[in-house]
């Protein structure tokens, strides 16, 4: 998705999977101190000459459990015309009023360009994951993303289990509320 004409700006405490993805992409790589919006803004200013800029962050930082400042990140992305990629693997299913993750919690769902998550945590599948994005991004990934091209499809029972979990979450917030109370 990103080329050597682009830049990716990653939170320093992102999950290892994001860090490895950043290392593998051809874009110019930048890091900002965890949650430091002033440094993120500086990196956005420094990379204004790039074709595309993408801010990459976890939704929930797994080691400490605190949330990325998605409202502020999205404001900066709008101001500097950057894309926002959120890995919400540690939030899908229970963060946000209806469990739709950190973008829902911060009211910025429509401002997230690429959302990734797993089916192996709160969504109950045990393996697999997904990317949600605009159709043009999904189409590009289906054609160019080597991990997608050279992997197997998720097993139908896992999809069935995840579908059931999503039905349960849509029908009631009781499970999510219990997690948040604890």
Describe each model-derived feature in a short phrase.
Residues 4, 24-26, 80, 110-111:
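Short, structured coil segments at secondary-structure junctions
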Residues 2-3, 33-38, 53-59, 94-96, ...:
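Pyridoxal 5′-phosphate
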Residues 80-83, 90, 95-182:
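Active-site C-terminal subdomain of aminotransferase-like
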Residues 16, 38, 59-64, 91-94, ...:
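Short, small-residue-enriched loops and turns at beta-alpha junctions
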Residues 30-86:
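Active-site phosphate-binding strand-loop segment of PLP-dependent enzymes
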Residues 16-25:
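Active-site-proximal loop->helix
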Residues 1-16, 182:
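Conserved PLP-anchoring active-site segment centered on the Schiff-base-forming lysine
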